[in-house]
């Protein structure tokens, strides 16, 4: 029965995220928010909503290692699998400075998380990501969003069409009440789905003798990364290479700054020494992909 609930949970997570993105994007356009902000924030936040739900619920329930493991492998999945599948569908030619900027931020926030984690590990008894660390990450998240808004205002960002091809309705066709209803239904699906996934995965792991870390690093992380995969593949098929890569980068950034930040602010996250290898591996992979992007002409 737990496996059935797990499948239902994943379905609600993915469908909820899809409905959330649709509703939030339409509301943003109706209110006149620039499309670039919709793409870099609403889309990325929407596809990261499953990870957010799973990690926050895990922190509230005390299953902290699921929160960390979920984000680590979700980012690895985004960087390797989602980017890999996307480039198979369409070769990505990186021309815009915005993408390189966001990739630099992606690398920096990953290193920041490693530094915060190493600091707690070196403290001996304080072997966790503290609430203060979480607040620092949340401040970084807010700063990133503010920077995006300011960069649009001063004309630094040129990706004005970043999300128009991903099923955004035109302003005249937007029904604000219908969009709000979509937003509510989407959030409900994400929350309920996240609860089902955490409870089912934890029960299955316990019955099979698996650790919480292993669960977070496998089935939960990959399942909650499916919205990123679907969104980027759709973008690649439609020829929107900047959207495809931008969604991956934005999701990775919010996974660390928002999800780990909020999760640790709710409850300090216990950090196993074994997770340091996962952190380092993620940074190495990110740097390698980053070098490939920066040398791309």
Language model features with spans:
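Hydrophobic alpha-helical segments, chiefly the membrane-spanning helices
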Residues: 1-297
């Amino acid at each position: 029965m737990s496996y059935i609930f797990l499948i239902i949970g994943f379905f609600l997570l993915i469908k909820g995220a899809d409905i959330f993105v649709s509703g939030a994007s339409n509301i943003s356009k109706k209110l006149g928010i620039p499309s670039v902000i919709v793409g870099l924030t609403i889309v990325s936040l929407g596809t990261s909503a499953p990870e957010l739900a799973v990690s926050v619920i895990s922190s509230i329930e005390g299953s902290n290692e699921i929160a960390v493991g979920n984000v680590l492998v979700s980012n690895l999945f985004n960087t390797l699998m989602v980017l890999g599948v996307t480039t198979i569908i369409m070769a990505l030619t990186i021309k815009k400075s915005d993408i390189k900027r966001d990739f630099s931020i992606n690398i920096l926030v990953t290193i920041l998380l490693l530094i915060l984690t190493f600091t707690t590990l070196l403290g001996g008894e304080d072997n966790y990501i503290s609430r203060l660390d979480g607040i620092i990450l949340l401040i970084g998240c807010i700063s990133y969003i503010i920077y995006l808004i300011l960069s649009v205002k001063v004309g630094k960002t040129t990706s004005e069409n970043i999300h128009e091809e991903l099923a955004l309705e035109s302003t005249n066709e937007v029904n604000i009440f219908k969009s709000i209803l979509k937003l509510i239904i989407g959030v409900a699906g994400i929350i309920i789905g996240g609860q089902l996934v955490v409870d089912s995965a934890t029960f299955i792991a316990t019955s099979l003798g698996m650790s919480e870390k292993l669960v977070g690093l496998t089935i939960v992380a990959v399942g909650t990364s499916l919205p990123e995969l679907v969104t980027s593949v759709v973008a690649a098929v439609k020829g929107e290479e900047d959207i495809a890569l931008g969604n991956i980068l934005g999701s990775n950034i919010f996974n660390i700054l928002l999800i780990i930040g909020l999760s640790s602010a709710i409850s300090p996250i216990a950090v196993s020494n074994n997770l340091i290898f996962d952190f380092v591996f993620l940074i190495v992979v990110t740097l390698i992909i980053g070098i490939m992007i920066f040398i791309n002409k």
